[in-house]
Amino acid sequence: MLDIQQIQQIIPHRYPFLLVDRIVEVEEGKRAVGIKNVSANEQFFVGHFPEYPVMPGVLIVEALAQVGAVAMLMKEENRGRLAFFTGIDNCRFKKQVKPGDQLRLEVEMIRFKGAIGKGKGIATVDGELVCETEMMFALGEK
């Protein structure tokens, strides 16, 4: 399990754009599971939407990408590098995410060749699917 400080040692994201609170499972270079506790105080709720706060779907996908980056960058040969988000395929949103929800973010690497990878991401709240997607990554130097 990784806490927020340990996550920040692996990926460069910081508040307000760090969208993972902790990693609860990880297999280096293969898969990871993260948790995001969605607070009513999230900055994006100020404008999305003031009378009906809903977490933007693109930020759910970004949270999945951050979990995938942790999995990839924990692999010994990738430590100290950056993971760049390069594409999204087959993305579907099934349910809204609101203040008070806890997002479970699961990412499994499907393919990894050289510096390019592809992962499948699933986000759930209380066991219900809210988002599924395939994401592409490229590893680069800082």
UniProtKB/Swiss-Prot annotation:
It is an enzyme of class 4 (lyase). Its main location: cytoplasm. It catalyses: a (3R)-hydroxyacyl-[ACP] = a (2E)-enoyl-[ACP] + H2O. The keyword Cytoplasm applies. Keywords: Cytoplasm, Lipid A biosynthesis, Lipid biosynthesis, Lipid metabolism, Lyase. CDD domains: FabZ. The active site is at H48. GO terms for molecular function: (3R)-hydroxyacyl-[acyl-carrier-protein] dehydratase activity. GO terms for cellular component: cytoplasm; membrane. It holds the Pfam family FabA. Its EC number is 4.2.1.59. It comes from the Bacteria. The keyword Isomerase does not apply. Belongs to the thioester dehydratase family. FabZ subfamily. HAMAP family: FabZ. Involved in unsaturated fatty acids biosynthesis. Catalyzes the dehydration of short chain beta-hydroxyacyl-ACPs and long chain saturated and unsaturated beta-hydroxyacyl-ACPs. PANTHER family: 3-HYDROXYACYL-[ACYL-CARRIER-PROTEIN] DEHYDRATASE. This is 3-hydroxyacyl-[acyl-carrier-protein] dehydratase FabZ. The lineage of its organism: Bacteria, Bacillati, Bacillota, Bacilli, Bacillales.
